[in-house]
Amino acid sequence: MGHGKKVATFTSPHIGSINDRICINGQPIADADFIRLAEQVKEMEKTLLQTHDQLSFFELLTLIAFLYFRDQEVDLVLLEVGIGGLLDTTNVVTGELAVITSIGLDHQETLGDSLEAIAEQKAGIFKAGKKAVIAKLPSETRLVCQKKADSLAVDLYQAGQDFSMLNGDFSSSLANLSQLKIGLEGTYQQENAALALQTFLLFMREGKEAVDEQVVRQALEKTHWAGRLERIRPQIYLDGAHNLPALTRLVEFVKEKEQEGYRPQILFGALKRKDYQGMLSYLTENLPQVELKVTGFDYQGSLDETDVTGYHVIPSYREFISSFEERADTKDLLFITGSLYFISEVRSHILGHEQIN
């Protein structure tokens, strides 16, 4: 956006309102536009139903997003896959750049029960003759991506090999930038920033457009992502880690805070259909000194006290958060995590409570 582009984003799930999934230059789609396009899609669906099944919720939203972005004549669309890639609703477009940020065991019932199988699904977004950028991945998944790229004549750029960032210094054949500041907390965010920066530089090179280094620096420093290691209060972090790869990164950050002398504790809420036992075990094993509490939330299918044994169960996260804020001192930190749906609900509660008071 800093380079004058009209940038659209389609993400899921939403953290605030459903409009947040469909944005242009950071501004969510207006209610009037959403309703107008939803009515168009429902009319289209009437014809579709003669030969096909009813559209899913995600398919409806994807269509609304595509129509909105077309009407608004955007320059660039950042399109986040819903699940996997190969068979995902979003994979009907031919993107100039495909990006894989991580590969871990998640949605096994749909994507397969091995890292290699999931990598096959994720690499399904690679398009013949285009470009792809991947994070630093385990060797078995990296090889799957490389094989897929080779079969489609895709130019593949790999973190740690073709580009990297260490201590704020970005290195790539496209550019070298030093002393960059990242707005998002957590050392691991440098890896995410490197991935985003490499993708941006490739996009700009493809369009033969000049890069303003100062704009890049300002953009990285101002980056904010709701529900992703978000410091919503001075002593409360929200992080939508909902699988083991994401949880690994959160644990890294919690350990950093422990080393700085803070006393972190974790409030965990998840969906029953997720591998919550594996996530809880991972937290217990890797953060043995950190208080871990489990709670339910209003979303259908969330954990409750009958699903977990051996953990401190909190009946009401609302009362717990209120109590924490009343008694916490400057070295106490609360990390709320386990599910993006949980984070969305907690975030609305905290911000809504602030508005009321």
Where are these regions (language model features)?
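Active-site-proximal loop/hinge segments that shape catalytic or ion-binding/gating pockets
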Residues: S339
